[in-house]
From Swiss-Prot:
GO terms for molecular function: structural constituent of ribosome. NCBIfam families: rpsB_bact. One of its GO terms (biological process) is translation. It comes from Xanthomonas oryzae pv. oryzae (strain KACC10331 / KXO85). Residues 226-267 are annotated as: Disordered. The lineage of its organism: Bacteria, Pseudomonadati, Pseudomonadota, Gammaproteobacteria, Lysobacterales. Keywords: Ribonucleoprotein, Ribosomal protein. This is Small ribosomal subunit protein uS2. It comes from the Bacteria.
Amino acid sequence: MPQVTMRQMLEAGVHFGHQCRYWHPNMAQYIFGARGKIHIINLEKTVPLFNDAMNYLSSIAQKRGTILFLGTKRSARASIKEEAERCGMPFMTQRWLGGTLTNFRTVKQSVARLKELEAAETDGTFDKLVKHEVLSLRREREKLDASLGGIKEMNRLPDAIFVIDIGHEDIAIKEAKKLGIPVIAVVDTNYNPNLVDYAIPGNDDAIRAVQLYARAAADAVLEGKAAAPNSASVREEEFSAESADEGKGRRAPAKKGEKKADAPAAE
């Protein structure tokens, strides 16, 4: 799969951490030093961890799994939405709704309501209502779409979550950990990398850095999908195998006019 280089990370500002006074001790192994009271992240540590995380995302996509892209902070919203849509994965870019994972059944009911309102707006139902009713329903639809539009096709819990800022998305990460859902996340110098399954030490604020992470994640997903076995060919192979097994257990019928072998005479 395409690998992100150290030069690309340097150009995107991935190596710039937070102010030294806000650092988390568990990030010490990933910190190269400090410059002007700002911690500098050791990209020699980041690059292999980043590529490992991307390989993991690709492996999930290859198994036809679902990865939820999560980035609700202002600097992450546009990139997360764009790249998630590009690779066909669900996303959340507005405020995380508590219980999105742990109370998924209720969330699915809200998604069903959103789809119902979208259908009503296009099938002529709204045309039969008075103006104030239409305005009320449209406001409801817009509110639901803003919070749940990115996950309306996510019919089950995701197989993993890709997160930009673990401090900003702490509730989502707690829900994922409670349910045993793997978390792949960018972790800046001010947070604990041990809170996630695949930590990517790096700047979680710079727009260019976020674009790099999101684009690479989407590329990994697309590559995994491309490597997934074709369902039609899998069924064809299974059918061929079953036919071969059945053929082994059958005896070819005797040709016309050919006598069957006589049974051995009893002694």
